[in-house]
Amino acid sequence: MVQLTIDNARGVTLCRVSLPANATVQQLLLQLTVAKPELRQAQAIRNDVRHVTHRLTPASTTTTTTTSVVSSNAQTLLQAGLVGQGATAETLVVLMAADAPAAASSAAAAAPSPTKAVAAQILDLFGCASASPSAGVRSQASVVPSTMDERQLELQRRIYAQIQQQQIDENLANALEYTPEAFAKVTMLYVPCTINQVLVKAFVDSGAQNSIMNKRTAERCGLMRLVDVRMRDVAVGVGRQEICGRIHMTPVNLAGMYIPFAFYVIEDQAMDLIIGLDQLKRHQMMIDLKHNCLTIDNINVPFLPENDLPALAALGDDENAMHAPRHQDPATTATTASNPAAPVLSEGERQARIEGFMTVSGITDPTQAAELLEAADWNPNVAAALLFDT
């Protein structure tokens, strides 16, 4: 199947259709008239990339065919030269009565500039990616046409990056509009408990394989005498921490219930106590997020509100907020990342950058190239982004 993008003489996309390469021109016209009835008056179909203009007979402009009509419209798209052998995507221009004479006299002059041609191919690439699955999988040859030289390929990469950033920005805007709750701060799950009459705020973490207690809390609760040093080891997760040993059993008071817990004692652990998956499964505890509590049998232990969380949890939220990524304009990001301050360039260096930027971008006016580079603090990547934005 070939994905055909149908444009008018002004470059406006009218529709997209999918046909096999051996389909006839008449079959193409039938599909076009279904999508756009006004296209039944088409006079010619042109492929600017292949420099082919296929004239249509009057009989082909109707939506019915007869066996007595034998015209050029009976040719296949391949025979007419409108599509290439093995091509998966083509752009065709439909010429109406007012467009055909002018197009015939100035076909070469109407050829798009290299920059606009590459931009159109990239936009077509993204449009085909969001089309129906019947459009087929684009081959590598259609993504990087053999007609492109190195300068066009560099332009293609920059346009691709610009369009990708625009789609990321649109995705962020949609998320902010439709799912703003995804950006809200999540309150950590802590429950109050008592060990040897010492109040401890325990962090409930179903992602922790074992329940752990830091050495400072074990000393505060008078449990160091129960630490089995034969269980010394090294905990490997986010970093490495030394395990002092294991407390095989100690009663923990949760909402008036004395439950035997086992803990590994960590030398340097930020959280006082973590109830891990081992004890959650052992005592069949259920994390009930709907009612915001830890359920043990028929008893609910409410999670601590945000204002009662340990100072460490609040500090961690603040640090996460400080280091959270913020949205920035792609041009601004590139400027601040690559050039914190405008570089001081000599006249020769500026002239060299202007010539290099003109070579890559296809700009023929040195004044325009210099203005774009000055606006981008002489960063060619940012200047290219500004060029494509305009």
UniProtKB/Swiss-Prot annotation:
User: Can you tell me which family this protein belongs to?
Assistant: Belongs to the DDI1 family.
Give the E.C. number(s): 3.4.23.-
The transmembrane residues are none
Q: Where is the active site?
A: 205
- Describe the effect of residue 205 to A: When expressed in a DDI1-deficient yeast mutant with high levels of protein secretion, fails to restore normal low protein secretion levels probably due to loss of catalytic activity
Q: Source species, please?
A: Leishmania major
Biased composition (Low complexity) is annotated at: 330-343
Q: How is its activity regulated?
A: Inhibited by pepstatin, diazoacetyl-DL-norleucine methyl ester (DAN) and nelfinavir. Inhibited by the proteinase inhibitors lopinavir and ritonavir.
Q: Name one GO molecular function term.
A: aspartic-type endopeptidase activity
Q: Report which superkingdom the organism of origin falls in.
A: Eukaryota
The entry's function note states: Aspartic protease.
GO CC terms, sorted = cytoplasm
- GO process terms (BP): proteolysis
- The protein in question is named Protein DDI1 homolog
Intracellular or extracellular location(s)? Cytoplasm
Q: Which InterPro entries match?
A: Peptidase_aspartic_DDI1-type, Peptidase_aspartic_dom_sf
Q: Where is this region: Disordered?
A: 322-344
Query: Which keywords fit this entry according to its UniProt record?
Result: Aspartyl protease, Cytoplasm, Hydrolase, Protease
Q: How does activity depend on pH?
A: Optimum pH is 5 with RE-(EDANS)-SQNYPIVQK-(DABCYL)-R as substrate.
